Structures are given as structure tokens and as C-alpha cells.
């Protein structure tokens, strides 16, 4: 079994990385790169000839998670969507956060550009304590392209398997509101 993928059918991140490291890792024409804490990018797997379309397809979502384990009532919460390649948002965007106490949903709105391979969406936590918030399968309403391209549209569909956050920046796949 290969330790990483480098084709349009398998753009999998290096398997030896932690979940937190994977959230900072993305494919470029040089190979797999990781964003270091100082803000620089480091090639961790060098792969040649990745610029052709048969190697790097449109960026796909690899992780979706809340950036905290809980939010105080009325606080600003954040959902982070991570792609497997660098991306460039082209329009504002939204996604839906589901509440456990009602059938109502909360709209999270894109907050800036995020990072090289992720976008943050902010929302206001409900004013009721003990409400569990989750992220379900959905399509993000937003314009986004692969980095450096104006013609390759990146994936905007969140699958249930994309919602994962094990040990990512203290994040979680569901959160509970607290007082």
C-alpha cells in the first residue's frame, strides 16, 4: 500500500501524518507540502511532473470540523473546511450547521480566505445551553478554484466521511453550547 497518492484517482495525503498535520498539508506541482507554524511551506514528499491534468485533478474536500470542542452561548463559532490542494475562494460562501434541539439550522458564513488549503466559516452559537451542533453532508454555496487557476473549480460537496477532526487544533466533529 503506497504511503501517499499522486494521481487523479488517489490524491491521498501522506499516511504517516497526524490529523493535525494533514489539515495543513496540500498537493502542489512540487509534491505534498505542509504549512509550517512560521507560515512557510515545506515539501515533505517531492513528486515530479505533477503539473499535468492527469496528475492533479480539481481539489477535493479532505476534512471538515469545528475549531473548538464547545462554544459559549452567543459566541462566534468556526467550521473549517480543508481541501487536499491549495484553493482560492472567488465569492462569499455559506454552509449549514445543524442544531440538536430544533429542526432549525444555522448558516455559517465564509470568514476571509483562511489558509492555503482551507476556508473558515463563522456562525453564532445558539443562546440555549446544552445544544449539540453538527455538520452534515451538504454542498457549500461558494465559488472556489484550484490555486492559480480561474478555470478549475474545486469540489464543494461535503460527504459524511469528510467530517472528521481527530486531534485537529482541539477541534471536534460536534460541539455543545455552554453557559
Question: Locations of the language-model features?
Answer:
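Non-catalytic beta-sheet/beta-sandwich ligand-binding modules that flank or precede catalytic cores
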Residues: 1-179
